[in-house]
Amino acid sequence: MEVLEEKPKEGKVKLKVETLDDLWHLYHVISPGDIVYAKTLRKQAQRSDSLRPEKVEAIPVFLGVRAEKINLHRFANQLRVTGPIVYASRDDVPLGKYHTIAVEPGMTITIQKERWRSHHVERIKEAVEASKRAKVMIVAMEDGEAEVAIVREYGLDFIASIRHNIGGKRYNVKREDEEKKFFHDVAKTIKDLIERENVQKVIVAGPGFYKENFYGFLRENYPELAGKVVLDDTSMGGRVGVYEVIKRGTVDKVYTETRVAQEIKLVEKVIERIAKDEPVAYGLKDVEEAVNYGAVDTLLVLDELLKGDDRERIEEIMEMARNLRANVVVVSSEHEGGDKLKALGGIAAILRFKIH
């Protein structure tokens, strides 16, 4: 994401949307009541002569829509913002009618808010910083099976599962042929994703020597891919192996700590503190009390809460925590750390001292 222009007095920020991750960030920035401006297509009936029916055409127009519904359609690579039109660049587009702006990578949009909360500003900054970081792919493989995932800002995006039935004993000619076909399939998948997603590093993980054999195959047949590969040991392949790579911190070693890895670590720290009866709070009531005491070191808030009925109350707690110099982290509901935080009420805090 790129910030093109800011107009603080008008509450406007103009942005260049670049990736699917940007759409996810914007989903958590745009709130009901905000106005989103963008070039879009709107179906308009064109008058014809009386003998012919009206012709409906999609005309290009610059619109401002007051957001009522905000939906992220990840598989379509779209963020759809629906609401009444409050501004139109053409006089023949009636104000007040409903329209959906489909925000996609490559588009330029402007967001206007009556009040920009600090967590909205932080989210924009994170998106800009994230666009500068290397994108990482994880391939967890074991004996004819490979799970391929990309580490995104919101969590793990499982892209492909590759499976070949590799039978027979080791060093059997037929088995070696099947294994080579499997390796070719995995390599081609990696190559396609590197080109499509602009991936800079590939972590190949798994138990035993299987990953080393694959790496040797890459060096011989796909040397340009081998240069992007980092090997890691995991107890299993498949999805379990992918999650193990995240927990082991291997992604962090490839580049600065990812948002996903950081969030999972913090949630695990909360759970560990609960088990050891160390300073911690969870659940809305207890966390709010801890913030009022000035006891919070790190506040964790599940992103879903910022779309729910308690949104304003949660935002006030976040503002107060920041004013008291607490670290505030919005945790994605798209990974296992988010699931665990949800089980704790969606909000928790690592405390500087006990309050009870």
Curated annotation (Swiss-Prot):
Q: Under which EC number(s) is this enzyme classified?
A: 3.1.-.-
From the Swiss-Prot or TrEMBL record, what is one GO molecular function term?
A: endonuclease activity
Q: SMART domains per the record? A: eRF1_1 (SM01194)
Which cofactors does it use?
a divalent metal cation
Q: Cellular component per GO?
A: cytoplasm
**One Pfam family linked to the record:** eRF1_1
Instruction: Name a single GO biological process.
Output: nonfunctional rRNA decay
Q: Which SUPFAM superfamilies match?
A: Dom34/Pelota N-terminal domain-like, L30e-like, Translational machinery components
Q: Which UniProt keywords apply?
A: Cytoplasm, Endonuclease, Hydrolase, Metal-binding, Nuclease
Where found, per UniProt? Cytoplasm
Function per UniProt: May function in recognizing stalled ribosomes, interact with stem-loop structures in stalled mRNA molecules, and effect endonucleolytic cleavage of the mRNA. May play a role in the release non-functional ribosomes and degradation of damaged mRNAs. Has endoribonuclease activity.
Can you tell me which family this protein belongs to? Belongs to the eukaryotic release factor 1 family. Pelota subfamily.
NCBIfam families assigned: pelota
Q: How does it assemble?
A: Monomer.
Entry's free-text remark on domains: The N-terminal domain has the RNA-binding Sm fold. It harbors the endoribonuclease activity.
The protein's name is Protein pelota homolog
In its UniProt entry, the species of origin is given as: Pyrococcus abyssi (strain GE5 / Orsay)
